[in-house]
């Protein structure tokens, strides 16, 4: 952040939004290539595929030189000279250029957010990440609230949004006209923008390319949607823009929407007066939102109709009603945050005796339950080439050139992360199949490297060389629960539910499950 202090002071004193000149500064791309504005980002640094750190500075200088040549932009706008332009400056239109500019622009566009929010946090001595909670904090909220609700509406937030709409949304925050014009040109000229803003399931989970700019635009769009439609008391702008890069591991977590009509009196009062419900709850994680209510099915259908019309008239694109599913909680389970969540109903008969008479009282208890989506998780493993679609382990061929310790370490981290994340499940037995596939995949990879059979490899190394990272989670759990609770060291641990509140980013394999 220190690199920007001189420019930011000038920025604040003049009250102008001159961000466009920063596109021609080398240190912008250096910061974008590293950890971002905050200097100590909590996510992995951005990786530029196709070149290493030593040659990155040379490519940045070449990029700035091309951008200084205004003829390149003139040629690119004229379609008749497109062949001449491509033959002359192929680098300017290469995927590498697209990636470098997108990361640099993502770093630049954070400046208005840092000015409006970063300095206020410093003046008020508010912790920077006070609103960034653990992913697992959403599930204790569901345990407390959802057992008393009746209907749930699953909303897949649509994202085939026009690029001009994104620019107009950003215009509320960035008032630098040249930067907005450059953004229009940048988004208009690249045919792969649709694949950039709409990540498919295969490329999203296992590719780090262009994520920072994608998350910035996506969260700006979602903020606009939530601010105008849901009108919650706590809104997304409390998360400063330096957190947009780390937002791939975050989720907006909101509580109860009470007396919605009082908040939105000046906005579509005739429409919103039908939606007053003190027991309506809204939760969003990435591209999926949950609306739950204790009211009737008619209210949920009104919300569904309202959302479809809102996307059509405000964001100017058609959203199909099948993207919103309304179900009863007692008969339905929904996928959120990598878990299948549902409300279990347990009938209970209580015998009550008064003098010479006895009565049987039938009661019903509701319990919020979370299970592991085994089949989708195996599908994620198969797409990552760890196993087949049926769950049979494969060797990870691209890891065969690594050392034995690196291979075992990578498989161990995958298993530990999955065990750590799914510690909140009430049925952990289903996770054993995932561990089995990862364990044999590790053994097959080592056998492929040493050109041996799995049996010969295990005989030489011993069967216990893979046990450490598979049993570490159980050993930790056995230390948490006293022996009075669990008579035997590891007996019944699969029934214990623990929400680890130190999880700040979701595993790629789990993250892959929630995208529509």
UniProtKB/Swiss-Prot annotation:
Keywords: Chloroplast, mRNA processing, Plastid, RNA-binding, tRNA processing. It is found in: Plastid, Chloroplast. Its main location: plastid. GO terms for cellular component: chloroplast. One of its GO terms (molecular function) is RNA binding. It comes from the Eukaryota. The keyword tRNA processing applies. One of its GO terms (biological process) is mRNA processing. The keyword tRNA processing applies. Pfam families: Intron_maturas2 (PF01348), MatK_N (PF01824). Belongs to the intron maturase 2 family. MatK subfamily. PANTHER family: MATURASE K. This is Maturase K. It comes from Colchicum speciosum. The lineage of its organism: Eukaryota, Viridiplantae, Streptophyta, Embryophyta, Tracheophyta.
